[in-house]
UniProtKB/Swiss-Prot annotation:
GO annotations of cellular component type: small ribosomal subunit
Function text: One of the primary rRNA binding proteins, it binds directly to 16S rRNA where it nucleates assembly of the head domain of the 30S subunit. Is located at the subunit interface close to the decoding center, probably blocks exit of the E-site tRNA.
GO biological process, one term: translation
InterPro entries: Ribosomal_uS7 (IPR000235), Ribosomal_uS7_bac/org-type (IPR005717), Ribosomal_uS7_CS (IPR020606), Ribosomal_uS7_dom (IPR023798), Ribosomal_uS7_dom_sf (IPR036823)
Encoding gene, per UniProt annotation: rpsG
Molecular-function GO term, any one: structural constituent of ribosome
The protein's name: Small ribosomal subunit protein uS7
Length: 156
């Protein structure tokens, strides 16, 4: 246990273009090696591509994609008398968003398009339509939780 007080949560400032706090947080997930300007260029470029292809509000599609990716339950390992059980637990709202953003960025990086902005745009549009690798990951996590429902009485 730490001897000090728990550090206060810092507020993330809204992003300058769309005024969205969740988009600003997403940019921090895209950012590598502290290069925020590069991350902004990638995210705004991806949202422009989405706007071009879908002819609708890109922020709306972004939020729809995050909802499609965010998991409701996950499994955590719990050791009971020499055996390790995968115990399904509900995901806190803040963790839901964090996982959704992380998966979105990870699977966008693995795509085959030329630039990161194109990859991110592709993954966003796929996720908003309920397909894509990030949505598959969510379904896999839900399937694992469903399969281990019998161990849910080992709550944390």
């Amino acid at each position: 246990m730490p001897r000090r007080r728990v550090a206060a949560k810092r507020e993330v400032l809204d992003d300058p273009k769309y005024g969205s706090q969740i988009l600003a947080k997403f940019m921090n997930h895209v950012m590598e090696s502290g290069k925020k300007a590069v991350a902004e260029r990638i995210v705004y470029g991806a949202l422009e591509k989405v706007k071009e292809r879908k002819n609708s509000d890109p922020l709306e599609i972004f939020e729809k994609a995050l909802d499609a990716i965010a998991p409701l339950v996950e499994v955590k390992s719990r050791r009971v008398g020499g055996a390790t059980y995968q115990v399904p637990v509900e995901v806190r709202p803040s963790r839901r968003n964090a996982l959704a953003m992380r998966w979105l960025v990870d699977f966008a990086r693995k795509r085959g398009e030329k630039s990161m902005a194109l990859r991110l745009a592709g993954e966003l549009m796929d996720a908003a339509e309920g397909k894509g690798a990030a949505v598959k990951k969510r379904e896999d996590v839900h399937r694992m939780a469903e399969a281990n429902k019998a161990f849910s009485h080992y709550r944390f």
